[in-house]
Regions:
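Short His-centered aromatic/hydrophobic patch
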Residues: 105-111
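A short, well-ordered alpha-helix in the C-terminal region of glycosyltransferases
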Residues: 338, 355-375, 384-387
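Short hydrophobic beta-strand element within catalytic cores of glycosyltransferases
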Residues: 309-312
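Conserved acidic donor-binding segment of nucleotide-sugar-dependent glycosyltransferases
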Residues: 324-325, 329-336, 345-351
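A conserved mid-protein helix/loop that constitutes part of the nucleotide-sugar donor-binding site
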Residues: 28-36, 212-235, 250-256, 337
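N-terminal strand-loop element at the rim of the active site
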Residues: 18-83, 172-179, 185-187
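Aromatic "clamp/platform" in nucleotide-sugar-dependent glycosyltransferases that forms part
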Residues: 273, 292
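Donor nucleotide-sugar binding/catalytic pocket of nucleotide-sugar-dependent glycosyltransferases
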Residues: 156-200
Length: 403
């Protein structure tokens, strides 16, 4: 009744939190469980993003009916763009109009703009809003190009405006220990992956179908480095293999052209964006990730949960998940020949390191991954995020009472 007769009064009393991402689709793709946690705690969830730039998914329809209130902010990727100021002013305006109890930022540029905007509002109004920032893989990492390290002083400076700096892999956690974080650094094992129901232990051993299928899931971008695997497939023509990539991106034409140049159009397939990834995982025999850079890759966790062995780059985040020779093979460097060697080892009858038949070996690796990925499950992550949100919001409520 109060909401009907006094809408403005009711709106002021409603507890609100704001989620911020540079591109649209990230929240419905990875964070809806956390949205529901906040809603269950009695908070109205608002989402600030560039809804004209949908990267995760095909459109914004997944937010329909969720109760999430959307705010268009014209974020840009480049920190040198003139549009950065526009997005900053838009976000400051939103924070001045709405009294949020907490702000949770994801992605580098939205994390920068979000924390600066919150600090601006504090200076103008004296109203402190706790800010969380999840770094889904810091830009500066071991082996990163020099230009990536330009983000280091930026993140170091912004740490003073960060009440919780959330990192998702151990390399990042160790690196930010010296940062002057206003609150504290928290390790959370990614966004979580749902665990499927247990299947028969020998389910994959019984699969005798040929050809065998290698699967990659991820955007067709330079960072994902799918071209390396295409080159590796050219070295494996004697094996009855098929390689499928699920995803879209700006490198699609280049990759398709390379497939044709190498005569691999009947062995390598670009499947485009797929919503039914679980079905592709069920058909695959091995998951491959040749990325240059990752935070804590969801695609690898999904493959592990599906009981697949994994061949992947030995990089930050990936080596948090995969144990070499137990859950698959980690490849040092980015030479197609090295990947071809590991794939050949995975799919040949026997190798110098093991007398175990190939199908049994792959199955044992998959079972190892299914057990290991439990520590990265949505249940584990959701429990940790619920406790974290409660802690931050209780601190904010206590601060408001003192003021």
């Amino acid at each position: 009744a109060r909401a009907a007769f006094y809408p403005k009064y009711y709106n002021c009393l409603m507890k609100k939190v704001l989620l911020v991402t540079r591109v649209s689709g990230f929240i419905p793709q990875h964070e809806m469980k956390h949205v529901r946690i906040l809603q269950d705690m009695g908070y109205e969830v608002h989402y600030a993003s560039d809804f004209n730039n949908v990267v995760y998914g095909k459109d914004n329809h997944r937010l329909d009916g969720t109760g999430v209130i959307r705010h268009q902010i014209d974020f840009v990727k480049s920190p040198f763009s003139r549009q950065v100021k526009k997005s900053y002013l838009q976000l400051v305006k939103l924070l001045m109009e709405e009294e949020f109890a907490m702000i949770h930022c994801h992605m580098p540029m939205s994390g920068v703009v979000g924390r600066l905007a919150a600090q601006k509002v504090y200076r103008q109004t004296g109203r402190h809003v706790p800010v969380l920032y999840t770094a889904h893989g810091l830009h500066f990492y071991t082996g990163a190009p020099l230009r990536n390290w330009l983000y280091y002083p930026v993140e170091y400076f912004l740490a003073r405006y960060t009440d919780r700096l959330i990192v998702i892999n151990h390399e990042d956690y160790d690196r930010v220990q010296s940062f002057p974080v206003r609150g504290c650094v928290v390790y959370v094992p990614g966004v979580g992956v749902p665990l499927p129901e247990e299947t028969a232990p020998n389910a994959r051993v019984m699969r005798k179908t040929t050809p065998k299928m290698l699967l990659s899931v991820g955007g067709l971008s330079a960072r994902k480095n799918h071209q390396l695997m295409i080159e590796a497939m050219a070295l494996l023509r004697d094996l009855d293999l098929r390689y499928v990539i699920c995803g879209t991106g700006d490198k699609q034409k280049m990759l398709q052209q390379r497939i044709l140049e190498l005569g691999l159009e009947h062995r390598v397939f670009l499947a485009g964006y797929q919503e039914n990834i679980s079905e592709w995982l069920a058909r695959a025999d091995c998951f491959v990730l040749p990325s240059y850079q990752e935070g804590l890759p969801v695609a690898v966790m999904e493959a592990m949960a599906a009981g697949l062995p994994v061949i992947a780059s030995d990089i930050r985040g990936v080596n948090d998940l995969i144990e070499h020779t137990k859950g698959g093979y980690l490849v040092q460097g980015f030479d197609p020949e090295d990947y071809a060697v590991k794939i050949r080892r995975m799919f040949t009858e026997k190798d110098a390191e093991s007398a175990v038949p190939r199908d049994v070996r792959r199955n044992l690796m998959g079972e190892w991954n299914k057990k290991r990925v439990k520590q990265f499950s949505t249940q584990v992550v959701d429990q940790q995020m619920r406790a974290l949100y409660q802690e931050v919001l209780q601190e904010d409520n206590a601060g408001r009472r003192r003021r």
